[in-house]
Amino acid sequence: MIQLKAYKFRIYPSDEQKIFFSKTFGCVRLVYNLMLNDRIKAYEESKGNPDKKIKYPTPAKYKKEYEFLKEVDSLALANAQMNLDKAYKNFFRNKSIGFPKFKSKKNPVQSYTTNNQNGTVNIFRKWLKVPKLKELVKIKVHRKIEGIIKSATI
């Protein structure tokens, strides 16, 4: 049986890296909110026709309209889509959970998740490698990681 473990480490980003992370947080939030808005519109349009199969856009659709989305990790944007899908499924499964809400810039807790593909997320002694970031991020590794890194949430 495969066992997944979560490790929590503190990172010490430089000023340039902080700007990159805040840009990524903003782009993930934007894509999530745009996709939620599109889903609400599609649901309103198809309300009268239950047989109509609704096709939802992917984050790639928004990259044509918003060029700055190309500067951040595409897997972070894809994970925003997966989070929205999960929120929708949870809502339709159990109405008491509540309808998915738009993400706010004012929320002090902001994060994004990226997946490891061929070593794009890796830890070298005291340094963390993150996709689309040119430099390594300083990290405090206080215990040994066993196994393979599947994803990282920043």
Where are these regions (language model features)?
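Nucleic-acid substrate recognition interfaces
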Residues: 1-154
